[in-house]
Amino acid sequence: MKPTELQIGDWIGRVSDDKCIIEDYRQVDWIRTGEIGMRYQKVWSIGCIEPIPLTYEILKKNGWKDAEFWCEYQEGNNSIQACLPDMRGRINGIDIEHFKCEYVHQYQHLLRLCGLNELADNFKV
């Protein structure tokens, strides 16, 4: 994973020396060459982090519900339908076809692109 793939507020996981993912997830607070600053945590080197796989369980934790062919999120004017893993669906009427979205931080980027910054920044893992 490279620092250029990340944005402030993205969720990532810390890995141990043997590269096994630890259930220690943090949001990126700042980024500089070779280091990532975490919220409420010390600095992590870029070699110590891994992306968090996006799963239906994580979507459901964030208010998504099962629909016939996908998960669906409805709140106010926001309407999202998502079909993993190739991310077919719609976000507020915008067709999303085969957007590469295997990881939580990629989904956060997609939400931000569609103007859903608050939802992206408050995403839970």
Residues of each region from the PLM?
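Charged phosphate-binding loop/patch that engages nucleotide di/tri-phosphates or the phosphate backbone
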Residues: 115-125
